[in-house]
From Swiss-Prot:
Name recorded for this polypeptide: Elongation factor P--(R)-beta-lysine ligase
Organism: Photorhabdus laumondii subsp. laumondii (strain DSM 15139 / CIP 105565 / TT01)
Keyword Manganese carried by entry: no
GO cellular component: cytosol
Residues that bind ATP: R100, N101, E102, N109, E244, L245, G300
Keywords: ATP-binding, Ligase, Nucleotide-binding
Primary role: With EpmB is involved in the beta-lysylation step of the post-translational modification of translation elongation factor P (EF-P). Catalyzes the ATP-dependent activation of (R)-beta-lysine produced by EpmB, forming a lysyl-adenylate, from which the beta-lysyl moiety is then transferred to the epsilon-amino group of a conserved specific lysine residue in EF-P.
PANTHER family, A to Z: ELONGATION FACTOR P--(R)-BETA-LYSINE LIGASE, LYSYL-TRNA SYNTHETASE
EC number: 6.3.2.-
Keyword Cell cycle in record: no
Molecular function terms from GO: acid-ammonia (or amide) ligase activity; ATP binding; lysine-tRNA ligase activity; tRNA binding
Amino acid sequence: MSETANWQPSAAIANLLKRATILAEIRRFFADRGVLEVETPAMGQFTVTDIQLFSFQTEFVGPGAADGMTLYLMTSPEYHMKRLLAAGSGPIYQLGRCFRNEEAGRYHNPEFTMLEWYRPHYDMYRLMNEVDDLLQQILDCESAESLSYQQAFLRYLDIDPLSAEKEKLREIAAKLDLSNIADIEEDRDTLLQLLFAVGVEPHIGTEKPTFIYHFPASQASLAEISKEDHRVAERFEVYFKGVELANGFRELTDSHEQCQRFERDNRKRAALGLPVRPIDENLIGALKQGMPECAGVALGVDRLVMLALGAEKLSDVMAFSITKA
């Protein structure tokens, strides 16, 4: 073994002690509100179809799987937790490890801790209020402000994202010195995401957390489409100090619509040369059985701890980041 082996933790022990205190505080927050802590598999037979997410894949070759069984490390506990909701669990939360085969850096690590919770009979706004309560308790920050996706674009880019044509989006991109990317991009949502990341995100959540809600319906993911305005989805994200902290939905409960969205994702995957994913029939079965109307949110715990401690990067609050794993 090399005498210079870098064996020490990524984070200072003092930071890990503070992290443990925050995790205990999160658990108290939900215990006080009667929300049940659950544990679901870190590996499963199905994974997400979302073209923006990349899973780790492995093969199980134990007894009963001589030909191999493809398994995926979970990018989120969402599908399993929804099956619990359909089985009658009531309100639930989970603090668990998730895995994404994507980037590693200041705000990203392939293995990370996710806080995810679901509230039957909550709408999007009521869940946003609960997220705000948690952030105030953990971060000792002001109450959050809220802007619709449309309001944010109008305020910072003077453009309506729900009606603007692709050519108009490219014009705005040019003003942000993004022509080299935008001019060859044909997907409207990718253009919107580019403008949001460069033209909106730097301006929001600087002094207090900011909720952005009512994303375009084309970016609904697993959220319901708004009954008041079919152009938007009942989806929100939370930003603070340059960091995206959470992503929440009023959850889609229609099994047929969910199956159609999975199939649409797979068509996009095929067009992009990405692997087509098997549709999670267990989730579809749970939705057919009847998952209660609910709202749910996923929050990055490592990022939350980083902000709470005033740290500069995730590795400052993780025992061993990927470079030391």
